[in-house]
Structure formats: structure tokens, C-alpha cells
Amino acid sequence: MHDIIVIGGGPAGLTAALYALRAGKSVLVIEKSTFGGQITWSPKVENFPGIPSVSGAELGDKFTAQALDQGAELELDEVTSVELDGDIKRVKTDFGGRVVMTVTSWEMLPR
């Protein structure tokens, strides 16, 4: 069982995982598609402070590597339901945790 389950492995989800890990929590991040999120599809990203021009794929890889380096567990799976009643929260993938964070984006953002 994990202290926190983050649903969504894009920039927001991986950032949430990093903050939880820094607070000493055990974290599982569940992503149904691509860790790093939609940014991984961008050929060039130039709007992150302190990071010069980088491909979205490279940036997504850096986000993912940092979460793993800090101790996050990453799982590729699709969450179809969440049970929020009681002290232990459950997702349909059978992982349990005390907190569930949902950080999702649009299915496909317009370009």
C-alpha cells in the first residue's frame, strides 16, 4: 500500500509525486499512456525557466527519471474507478493508498 496514489503521469502528476516524496510519503503514479504527458509530443519546448530549448520527449524523460530517482513507483495502467470512502482509498487497479490525487489533462489538446 502507498501513502499517496497520483493518477496522471504528466508534468503536474510527476511534480505532485516529487513534493509528496520530499515530505517522506510513499508514492505510486499511475499513467494510462505516456509518462511525461502530452509535452512529450512537442518537438521543441522553450518555456520552462532555467531550461534552454529541449524536445518534449527529452523533458518528459527528465521528469520521469527524477521521479524514479526520488523513489516514486510508476505504473502504466488505466484507472476506471476510484473508491474514496473510508480511510483507505482504492483504485480499480487494486493499488491502495491513504490519498488519491487526480491530475489529468484533455484527451488531446489543440495544437
Predicted segments with their positions:
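FAD-binding core/adjacent interface of flavoenzyme oxidoreductases
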Residues: 1-7, 22-23, 74-111
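Glycine-rich FAD pyrophosphate-binding loop
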Residues: 5, 22-41
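Glycine-rich Rossmann-fold phosphate-binding loop(s) that bind the pyrophosphate
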Residues: 8-12
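Flexible, glycine-rich phosphate/dinucleotide-binding loops
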Residues: 13, 36, 54
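Gly/Ala-rich phosphate-binding loop of Rossmann-like dinucleotide-binding domains
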Residues: 17, 21
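Amphipathic, positively biased hydrophobic alpha-helical segments used for protein targeting
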Residues: 23-27, 31, 47-48, 61, ...
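Surface-exposed, flexible loop/turn segments at secondary-structure boundaries
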Residues: 35, 47, 111
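N-terminal Rossmann-like dinucleotide/flavin-binding domain of flavoprotein oxidoreductases
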Residues: 40-98
